[in-house]
């Protein structure tokens, strides 16, 4: 990690300290002289620059967004500018280990969930592969302040004020960009694992990525499957639909995986959010359409249900959880809507790690 940090700073010199103006302060200032007046005006300008946002800064662009002092950043304007110019290619190169990147997409209201997920990832020794795709500037600055190089923002930034609910227009806008992000990483030549941050790792998932398939994914249906179930894409139901989750995906940089991401993006672009279909207004239906339309061209692999259970099974069938104890790898806190309800459920099941184990996260305690 130390070597990575050194490389990062060699490529992009950062400084969180204000520029020194000692040479100015040592110069004589004569009252009413032209030079003295200019220096007084310069000092006033610098003073205002420290305490007021400059035009075009995130603070001015989003005056109501930085409302939580707990996520305020101490980065200097220069450092913020450097992180705004940080590219996905730079970020992926920095975090990739053995050609693999682990990606999540986060807006600032979900920083506690990011931290909770990171604790679980760190326990499996895979945190250095993590790249946080920040959906707002608060997240970009906070993550890179605490953990330099591990967050990147791909413009445009989304509204950072709201924790989007499943089915809302904001949630649709948030998730609709996902296949493009993943495709860009594949085009750079990396394997990529995507996770939602309302997940917790209980074991190392990489040992379950058997073979060399193009794409790996999980079933979102809560109906119990046999332990030795097929790893093929499930057959569509009577409505012609499959219910694969877009929450946990692993992709290799193959033509098949790239084709799947392109088709997913096309399906998303062909649908628009509306109130009448708001409970389907997320990227998952489009992902399933893309899977079914490319199934004969892409090498697909359905991951084990017992290892990667949907929240509709794990949190609703205590008997099954007991029978399969020790076999669970990643638990997804879905089949529930609402930030507070998700947090309470994690707490009820002993999976909310932030309160007692924050120091195990690369971000530490978020303040």
UniProtKB/Swiss-Prot annotation:
The residue spans the entry assigns to the Lumenal side of the membrane are as follows 57-367
- InterPro entries, A to Z: Nucl-diP-sugar_transferase (IPR005069), Nucleotide-diphossugar_trans (IPR029044), UDP-D-xylose:L-fucose_XylT (IPR052636)
Q: Which UniProt keywords apply?
A: Cell wall biogenesis/degradation, Glycoprotein, Glycosyltransferase, Golgi apparatus, Membrane, Signal-anchor, Transferase, Transmembrane, Transmembrane helix
Q: How would you describe the post-translational modification of this protein?
A: Glycosylated.
Q: Which GO terms describe its molecular function?
A: UDP-xylosyltransferase activity
Q: How does it sit in the membrane?
A: Single-pass type II membrane protein
Transmembrane segment boundaries:
36-56
Cofactor annotation: Mn(2+); Mg(2+)
Stretches of the chain found on the membrane's Cytoplasmic side: 1-35
Q: Where in the cell is it found?
A: Golgi apparatus membrane
Q: Where is this region: Disordered?
A: 1-21
Mind naming one GO cellular-component term on file for this protein? Golgi apparatus
PANTHER family, per the entry: UDP-D-XYLOSE:L-FUCOSE ALPHA-1,3-D-XYLOSYLTRANSFERASE-RELATED
Q: What is known of its domains?
A: The conserved DXD motif is involved in enzyme activity.
What is the official name of this protein in its record?
UDP-D-xylose:L-fucose alpha-1,3-D-xylosyltransferase
